[in-house]
C-alpha cells in the first residue's frame, strides 16, 4: 500500500508505524516534508465493519479516530472510506474478491486516484472560535490518552521497563500512590495537549 500510494502522488511519504499499532495509532501516516497530511487505518480485506457500526467490531476505535483526525481514510485495501473532520465524504471500491481472486474495478481505481490526490492536498482548517478549538483539542487529548493508556498496559503486561512505565512508577511513589494507568494517561494527554 505504501509504494502504491507514493507512486500516485509525487512528493508524499506514506509511513507504516507497526510499533504504535498496539497503542491505537492509525496504521499509516501520509506526509509531505514531514508534515502530516492525513491518516489511514487499514483493516483486513473484506472487513465487514468498515463503517464502524458494530459495537463488537471497529466502532470504538473508529469513533476515536474520526473525532481526533481531520483527514482520514479507513480501508480494507479494496474499499476506501474518506473522512473529513469526522464526516464520511465518499467511498470508493477498487476491486472485489471473487473465488479467492482479487478482480480490479478500473473505474473505481481511476476514482480512487483522484480522491487520493485530493486527500494529499488537504489543508487544515482555520480555527475561528474558542468552541471549535476546544472541541478539536478535546478530541486530540482523548486519542492521546488512549494511546498512552494502551502503551502503559502493554508495558505492564509484557513487563517492559519503558521510560513511560518508569514515570508511572515514579508518579505513584512521589505524587499519587493509587493512580491507575488510565488516570496517568489522562493527566499526560491533557498536559501535552493543553500545555502547548
Task: Report each predicted region and the residues it spans.
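Charged, often flexible domain-edge or linker segments that flank or initiate folded functional domains
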Residues: 25-26, 30-31, 35-45, 51-196
